[in-house]
Structures are given as structure tokens and as C-alpha cells.
């Protein structure tokens, strides 16, 4: 049945109107609230007695560059494995991250850098905003191919707000340690997306099952994303940590953990694979689990051996998750996790939080010496014992899971609004629904889609 002109025109205007509305509202809020901080304001910086080389830009910007590449290149290409959804994977990653970094600058600014009624921004604001965008993209991975761009933008509005609140509760109120974001980024983003996917469950998704797979070149593009993420992950985990030994130690622990998770992934993939063959899905994803698992404990005295052990465990568990748990997740729990974020970010994120609990509980003055104050200031001041700090870390994990679950459920209800126009079951994982695809005539490409029922939407 042909759509009425009104219904046909609505999706055409939906995305541009929403983009204009969100950008306009954000710009107004920036004009009212956002100002340069003392290291970026020309008058304030030159008023002080210091060298230009003392500016924090020179210490933080290299890390920011690496994080920026991870968000826009790494995540985008990692999700480009679907044979008919490469434009959307990379393009919608670009769109969501570009909006999320603006919106999160405001949300995080209200919680962390509001002084005199203004939000003061710096290179640290850019790093933190990219971290928030990373959490959004993790959630995007769980619902990849099953939602439209307007739905994704509204998801970003809600998730960024909840991310900021959860981060404030953990880092400021509970004062837990989570520099690399095992809890605030990976666990939150994964379970927000998984609950969202459960609410948006599509019982008739089998109609698009033939497109929910990769081809040789799409897997190769995804592997490019993996390599970018793998190379820059030490910068990701160490970017917000204390300059000096803390940042150095975080990068080192992440470096070793990633290498061990890669070996664990190859070993387990060959072990569980048919006739001992490697599965590219495992290599693309589980090899990165080592970066996730040391997100919390990376700046602590984890030891190089501890980093290797944690990384190997994460890579092994993640691979087993892709092989055995993902099918159960869909069949028994009705969670259609397109990218397997539960295996790459969810389980390793929880393991990383628990690893943090263990390492914090073992912290002593003898192990940290004078550096105890920079890693665990409350323990150094005698306001908390190592065990009580460990309990706060554990409570922070539960708080994160609560915010993610409630937020994902609310997001799912929001995205189910009929006016948002999600793709039909037979049109999921298909670029041509939203993009001009070169070399394909629209009627020829859409022919098989139109033969299916068009109104079975989430």
C-alpha cells in the first residue's frame, strides 16, 4: 500500500528539523553559559606569570588527539562489518559523536566546571566530552541497524544527560576511581544499550537476517577500526589521569593488557572455532577487551603481571561470550545485540570494576609511598581505609548498572514513539533506507524490501 503524501514527507523533514533544533538550542546554551577557562582566555592567561609551555594544552592535547581518532575512526569502522550498513555505521557515528560532544560539554560542565554561573572549557573538556560520546557509541552498537537517525539523536540527548549524572555521582559524591571508564563509559554504555535493545525487541527481525552478516571487505574495514582502537587505547585510559607517574603507569598497564587479551582471543577463537579456524568477529572485538578491563585499575599499582593476567582473562571471556552467550541473549532474554557490546564492553567493564575493587582493597602505604595521595587521596588523608574505598568502588558499579538500566528502559520507551519512524523489520541493516548508494537504482534496490510488510516496526 502506498504511503500518503503526509507520511512520506514526514521522515524527509524529521532529521533536518531535529538537527536544526538541537544545534540551535545547543548554540544558545553555549552563548549563555560557556566561556574559556584561564588557560584558553587571552586576557587571563597573559595576566599570569608563566611560560606558554606551562599551558596544559601541551600536556593533554596529544592524548586528546588519540581519543578523538578512537571515537570518530575506531568506533565508526569497527561497526562497519555489516554488508549493507557501512554508510550508516560510519556516518551515524559521525553524527552522534558530533552532537554528543557539544551536549556533553554542557551537561558535564554544569557538574564539573561551573564557576560564577559559567561553564569554563579547556582541553580537558574536550577529552571528557569525547569520553561521553564513546559511551553513546557503545550503546549505538547494541541497536545498530534497527533505528533511524532521529531516534539515535534523541537517544543521545537522554544518554548524555544520564551519563553526566552517573559520572557526577561516582566521581564527585562517592569519589570512586575510574579514570579509564570501566564503569562510567563501558559498563554504562553497554547496559544502557542492551536494555534499550530489549525494549525495542523485534520478533520479526528474521526478515532482515540475511543482511545481518559481513562480507570479506566489510570485515576488513571493521578490522581497520580494531587496529586504530588497539593502538590508541593506552591514550584513552591515561588521558584524564594525573600527569606524571599516574599517566605513565596507566598507559603501560593498558599496553600490556591489550597484548595479552589479543593472545587470549586468538587462542580461544581457534579452540572453539570449527576445525580450529579463527573467527574474525572474535578478533575484531575480543582483542580489545584488555583495554576495557583495566579502565578502572590502570592508574593503580596493578603490576605488569596483573595487567597481563587481567587482559588474558578479558580476551578469553569476551571470545566465549561471542561464541556462546550472544545466541542465548537473543533466544532467552530477547536482547538483539547487533555488535555484541555485552561481550566487548559489558562483561569486561564489570570485570574491570571488580578488578578495581580488588586492587583498591590491597592498596598500602608501602606499595604507593608518597604517591598514595595522588591515586587515593582519601586513603592518604585517613578519611577512608583501603577496604572502605573498595566498598565504595563496588557500590559505584551497582549505581552505574542502575542508571544504565533505568535510562535504557526510558530511552526504549522514547524511541518507540510512532512519530519517530523506525525502519520496518524487512528494512533493517540496509543503507538505502537513509542514504544515496552509488551504483544502485533506488527502485531496483528497494524492490525486495517493498515486497515485505512495511509496517512491522519497533
UniProtKB/Swiss-Prot annotation:
Protein name in the entry: Ammonium transporter Rh type B
Subunit structure: Interacts (via C-terminus) with ANK2 and ANK3; required for targeting to the basolateral membrane.
GO molecular function: ammonium channel activity; ankyrin binding; carbon dioxide transmembrane transporter activity
Domain of life (superkingdom): Eukaryota
Known catalytic reactions: NH4(+)(in) = NH4(+)(out); methylamine(out) = methylamine(in); CO2(out) = CO2(in)
PTM info: N-glycosylated.
Motif position, Basolateral sorting signal: 429-432
Function (record text): Ammonium transporter involved in the maintenance of acid-base homeostasis. Transports ammonium and its related derivative methylammonium across the basolateral plasma membrane of epithelial cells likely contributing to renal transepithelial ammonia transport and ammonia metabolism. May transport either NH4(+) or NH3 ammonia species predominantly mediating an electrogenic NH4(+) transport. May act as a CO2 channel providing for renal acid secretion.
Native organism taxonomy: Eukaryota, Metazoa, Chordata, Craniata, Vertebrata
Membership in a protein family: Belongs to the ammonium transporter (TC 2.A.49) family. Rh subfamily.
Gene name as annotated: RHBG
Species name: Canis lupus familiaris (Dog)
Any one annotated GO CC term: spectrin-associated cytoskeleton
Compartments (UniProt record): Cell membrane; Basolateral cell membrane
Cytoplasmic side: 1-13, 83-90, 146-151, 201-219, 274-279, 330-343, 415-458
TM annotation in the entry: 14-34, 62-82, 91-111, 125-145, 152-172, 180-200, 220-240, 251-273, 280-302, 307-329, 344-364, 394-414
Alphabetically ordered keywords of this record: Ammonia transport, Cell membrane, Glycoprotein, Membrane, Transmembrane, Transmembrane helix, Transport
